[in-house]
């Protein structure tokens, strides 16, 4: 056999390897092929190809492994079990940029499934190999490395700490300054995954100077980038007053309010979440949001999310806006009044009534309670907005969750304690359970002694008669309030409306002796 014919065998073997690995990589894109390849032992066949002397075969083998591992946690565990990760990590520092992208994809695909798999990636030494990739000239290699780092960090605080200790954050801050939009997105996402866990991790991201570079990107034309930027700023701001102030001092207001009107649903939602995380900390931060026009912007956002709910099928989109309004209103009567003036009651009531998910109804009930609990004027705004009746309905409905019932009861109790709008109180008297009637009657007992017109209206609307009927079946505080209200009327009026009055009259007929001529 001549030398030429021998080489032909080698060439045929190489072509066969290329054909095989490319076919496997292509087949791995279709879910219906995964189980067949797994049963055929694809992992064991691909593993030696990672060390092939032909770079294109190495890259295709890594790509195929990444697609398989990305499909399910079982296949990702198979990658770990076949000891493929150490080979990838070793090659990551040796090979060309194409292989580095493919290898980083495999690490990301394994790490994404669970904390245990992400820990396996860390234990393989992947972070030490990924960090230099963040300094590569090729932006696509940086993207692949940043993406894998974010997927490792997202699971737990310990994993995020490992990522931080590897020195990734300063390099991610440099990456976000690069011109490539995709690299900016992935870097912002990775920093968000790091800082979401603890105040200390968020502080490390802040100390690296990230906020100064994130803040201007709020106005970037790319929607996917704005999603990640708003998310990252919210993850920083949520931990403490100091971190929220760092975000505010980076001049995110009023620009972030414009994101509440963005055409992209996730930009709007993430912006609302960021505002919520800032608003919840102190009255001063809530006031800053209101002074920037935030109350009206949030109210419009909630109303708009309600209108778009049918289109997107995403009721959760309005949740951060509802909660942000509640946090703002909770701090002071002035801030609550700003919400009322911004016409915030109606969209919150609409969410309470129309939203199918109980946790959003519960958030709406809580926010309405924060608005109405301050003064009689605040409570009147909710009473005139027909809120009380709907809170009561949520409280007593058989299908309401425990959380919704609790929040509706607390909100109703807080509003009733300040409510002096008797026309709104009276319908609740008949329809409420005893535990709510108690709060309603307490208000009547406090208000009727000082208002002649209210006393007359209470009689004309049947309230006094209902009280006499109620008096026969209750005791305790309820009985005390009924007696206090009865004391506002002449005894003969009270007697006239008592259930036994007709019997008393009939008894008098029996006792009466007519004058016989």
Please give the residue ranges for each predicted region.
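Residues that form ligand- and interface-recognition hot spots within folded domains
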Residues: 41, 50, 83, 92, ...
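Buried hydrophobic core positions in alpha-solenoid tandem helical repeats
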Residues: 3-9, 45-47, 87-89, 129-131, ...
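Short inter-helical turns and helix N-cap capping residues of alpha-solenoid HEAT/ARM repeat scaffolds
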Residues: 12-13, 53-54, 95-96, 137-138, ...
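N-terminal "cap/leader" segments of large eukaryotic alpha-helical scaffolds
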Residues: 1-36, 41, 45-48, 494, ...
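Alpha-helical solenoid repeat architecture
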Residues: 18-31, 45-48, 59-71, 90, ...
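Alpha-solenoid helical-repeat scaffold
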Residues: 374, 378-517
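Intrinsic low-complexity tandem-repeat regions in disordered proteins
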Residues: 65, 76, 85, 107, ...
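Short, hydrophobic/charged alpha-helical patches characteristic of ARM/HEAT alpha-solenoid repeats
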Residues: 8, 33-40, 57, 74-82, ...
């Amino acid at each position: 056999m001549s030398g030429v014919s021998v080489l032909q065998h080698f060439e045929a073997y190489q072509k066969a390897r290329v054909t095989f690995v490319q076919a496997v990589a292509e087949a791995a894109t279709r879910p219906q092929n995964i189980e067949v390849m797994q049963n055929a032992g694809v992992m064991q066949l691909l593993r030696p190809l990672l060390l092939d002397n032909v770079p294109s075969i190495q890259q295709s083998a890594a790509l195929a492994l990444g697609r398989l591992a990305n499909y399910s946690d079982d296949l990702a565990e198979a990658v770990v079990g076949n000891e493929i990760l150490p080979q990838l990590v070793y090659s990551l520092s040796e090979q060309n940029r194409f292989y580095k992208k493919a290898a980083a994809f495999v690490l990301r695909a394994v790490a994404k499934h669970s904390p245990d798999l992400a820990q396996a990636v860390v234990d393989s030494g992947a972070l030490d190999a990924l960090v230099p990739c963040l300094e590569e000239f090729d932006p696509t290699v940086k993207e692949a490395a940043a993406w894998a780092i974010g997927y490792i960090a997202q699971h737990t605080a310990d994993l995020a700490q490992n990522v931080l200790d590897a020195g990734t954050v300063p390099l991610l801050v440099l990456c976000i300054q690069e011109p490539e939009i995709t690299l900016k997105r992935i870097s912002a996402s990775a920093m968000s995954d790091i800082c979401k866990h603890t105040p200390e991790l968020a502080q490390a991201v802040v100390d690296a100077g990230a906020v100064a570079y994130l803040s201007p990107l709020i106005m970037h034309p790319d929607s996917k980038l704005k999603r990640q930027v708003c998310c990252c700023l919210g993850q920083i701001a949520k931990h403490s007053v100091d971190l929220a102030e760092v975000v505010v001092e980076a001049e995110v207001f009023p620009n972030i309010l414009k994101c509440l009107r963005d055409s992209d649903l996730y930009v709007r939602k993430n912006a609302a979440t960021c505002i919520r995380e800032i608003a919840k900390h102190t009255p001063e931060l809530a006031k800053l949001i209101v002074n920037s026009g935030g109350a009206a912007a949030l109210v419009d956002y909630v109303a708009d999310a309600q209108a778009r709910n049918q289109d997107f099928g995403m009721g959760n989109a309005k949740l951060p806006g509802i909660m942000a309004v509640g946090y703002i209103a909770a701090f002071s009567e002035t801030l609550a009044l700003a919400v009322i003036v911004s016409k915030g009651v109606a969209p919150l009531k609409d969410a309470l009534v129309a939203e199918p998910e109980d946790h959003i109804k519960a958030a709406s009930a809580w926010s309405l309670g924060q608005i109405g609990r301050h003064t009689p004027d605040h409570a009147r705004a909710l009473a005139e907005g027909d809120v009380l009746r709907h809170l009561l309905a949520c409280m007593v409905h058989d299908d309401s969750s425990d959380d919704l019932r609790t929040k509706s009861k607390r909100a109703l109790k807080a509003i009733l304690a300040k409510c002096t709008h008797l026309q709104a109180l009276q319908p609740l008297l008949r329809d409420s359970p005893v535990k709510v009637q108690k709060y309603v009657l307490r208000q009547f007992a406090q208000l009727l002694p000082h208002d002649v017109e209210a006393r007359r209206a209470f009689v004309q609307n049947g309230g006094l008669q209902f009280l006499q009927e109620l008096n026969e079946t209750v005791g305790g505080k309820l009985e005390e309030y009924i007696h206090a209200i009865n004391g506002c009327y002449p005894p003969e009026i009270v007697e006239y409306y008592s259930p036994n009055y007709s019997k008393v009259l009939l008894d008098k007929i029996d006792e009466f002796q007519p004058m016989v001529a």
